[in-house]
């Protein structure tokens, strides 16, 4: 009999519990948005499709994987430029370290950053339609760091909708 009361109570409370939970599409980093742009880390981004890998040399010495939300992936596959509003690109970066198992190969070491670009041509009209977020350990970098984002994109990839990454089919 007590078990029946537990089930009834659970059934009555379920709508309240689920209503208080954030929807799946809501950011998992609501308390930590990037300065200037207000970009947050989207929920579920680690399940997004790979756009391309990359390797940054020099002082960065990083291996990177760039992923995109479904809207970004469709734009890449169709060759659509400019990217549509709502496209999100995320660069995951790790220190490049030599493989212990295979001489001459390199593997991801410690995670360095998660960098996010969000296309919203109205909200981010002063930065080519893109908002930027750079996170270390899920915490946004400071404002000074974010002030450098668009300048680099504008100087180097203005003719590719300010996006460095090319699709690796």
What are these regions (language model features)?
Residues 1-4:
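Positively charged n-region of N-terminal signal peptides that target proteins for export
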Residues 6-16:
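Bacterial N-terminal signal peptides
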Residues 22-29, 34-64, 80-169:
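Sequence context surrounding c-type heme c attachment/ligation sites in exported
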Residues 64-74:
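Short, structured beta-strand/loop micro-motifs enriched in basic residues and often containing a Trp
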């Amino acid at each position: 009999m007590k078990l029946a009361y537990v089930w009834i109570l659970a059934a009555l409370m379920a709508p309240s519990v689920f209503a208080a939970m954030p929807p799946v599409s809501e950011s998992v980093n609501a308390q930590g948005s990037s300065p200037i742009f207000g970009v947050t880390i989207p929920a579920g981004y680690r399940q997004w499709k790979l756009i391309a890998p990359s390797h940054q040399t020099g002082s960065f010495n990083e291996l990177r994987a760039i992923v995109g939300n479904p809207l970004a992936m469709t734009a890449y596959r169709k060759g659509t430029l400019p990217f549509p509003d709502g496209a999100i690109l995320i660069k995951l970066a790790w220190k490049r370290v030599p493989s212990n198992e295979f001489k001459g190969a390199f593997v991801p070491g410690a995670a360095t950053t998660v960098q996010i670009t969000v296309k919203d041509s109205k909200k981010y009209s002063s930065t080519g339609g893109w908002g930027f977020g750079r996170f270390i350990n899920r915490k946004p970098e400071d404002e000074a760091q974010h002030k450098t984002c668009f300048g680099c994109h504008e100087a180097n990839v203005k003719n590719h909708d300010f996006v460095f990454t090319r699709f690796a089919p």
